[in-house]
């Protein structure tokens, strides 16, 4: 009697063809949030102008043409010239680069400081949490712009100092939001299980808690860029921000005050650029918040049942 050894054919691996997190987020943004999509387009144009500013500026941003000062828009100078004959378009494009550096750098520091303070406070709890939160309460009771004006009066006025000041001062206020997210995650059972099997507190914080508050951090980052750009422009307009040699949009608006009656376009172009960029970033940030935060979407998260499917499920169970 002979037996045949039949071997089952190896099962083919089923590939997961679902889109990645960011691609899925982009698809939902385009389909569900038209204003957010508009904001994303503004951000792309704004960042492209900042990154490639040296290649697309018609003239050097400090190049002076005294014989062509205070000219209106023309074929040579598309947006006109300022009081020293410098090309307004070139200075506006270079200002986008300054705003991009301030916005990204300061917001990155915002999130980093918020994680260091908020995650530590929320994870440790107890007296540490109480002491840290009382400090945050006192800090938030002082108007933020007053703090910025005071600090920038003492420190030297340059780009690095501006980024550090905006990043650190803004990050302390954001620590409370990170703390709330950490406390919500810390109550999950897998955190207790990780502690029970001997994981160190640092490993639990870095491996299990921080990755799970990424939606909160992404929302903080996208909403913070516009605020930091606006803060830098406000400080520079008042004379407490960047020095006149750096053509940020706030500096351009400040230098145009003496010519508002005769040449209002000197303030018009940087004002429009500032308003449009901040509006676009805020619309994009609001849309990302709505898409990532289930509480703002009626409790329906990415992997939850929609209202329609939930009703269908209840109807089938009732039968």
Named regions from a protein language model:
Residues 86-101, 105, 125-133, 183-187, ...:
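Amphipathic cytosolic juxtamembrane alpha-helices at the membrane-cytosol interface
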């Amino acid at each position: 009697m002979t037996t045949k050894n039949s071997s089952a054919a190896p099962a083919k691996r089923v590939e997961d063809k679902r889109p990645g997190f960011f691609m899925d987020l982009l698809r939902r943004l385009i389909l569900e949030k038209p204003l957010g999509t508009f904001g994303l387009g503004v951000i792309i144009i704004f960042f492209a102008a900042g990154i490639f500013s040296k290649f697309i500026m018609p003239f050097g941003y400090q190049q002076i043409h005294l014989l062509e000062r205070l000219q209106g828009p023309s074929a040579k100078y598309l947006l006109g010239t300022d009081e020293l004959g410098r090309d307004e378009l070139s200075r506006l494009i270079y200002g986008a680069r300054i705003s991009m550096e301030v916005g990204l750098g300061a917001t990155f520091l915002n999130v980093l400081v918020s994680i260091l303070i908020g995650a530590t406070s929320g994870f440790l709890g107890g007296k540490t949490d109480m002491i840290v939160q009382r400090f945050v309460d006192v800090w938030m009771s002082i108007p933020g712009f007053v703090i910025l004006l005071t600090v920038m009066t003492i420190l030297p006025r340059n780009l690095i100092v501006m980024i550090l000041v905006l990043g650190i001062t803004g990050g302390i206020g954001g620590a409370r939001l990170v703390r709330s997210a950490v406390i919500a995650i810390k109550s999950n059972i897998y955190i207790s299980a990780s502690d029970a099997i001997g994981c160190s507190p640092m490993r639990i914080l870095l491996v299990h808690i921080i990755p799970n508050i990424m939606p909160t951090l992404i929302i903080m980052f996208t909403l913070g860029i516009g605020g930091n750009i606006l803060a830098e422009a406000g400080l520079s307009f008042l004379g407490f921000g960047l020095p006149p040699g750096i053509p940020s949009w706030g500096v351009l608006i400040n230098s145009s005050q003496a010519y508002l009656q005769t040449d209002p376009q000197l303030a018009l172009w940087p004002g429009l650029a500032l308003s449009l960029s901040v509006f676009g970033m805020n619309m994009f940030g609001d849309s990302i918040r709505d898409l990532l935060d289930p509480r703002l979407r009626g409790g329906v998260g990415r992997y939850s049942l929609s209202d329609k499917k939930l009703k269908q499920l209840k109807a089938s169970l009732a039968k």
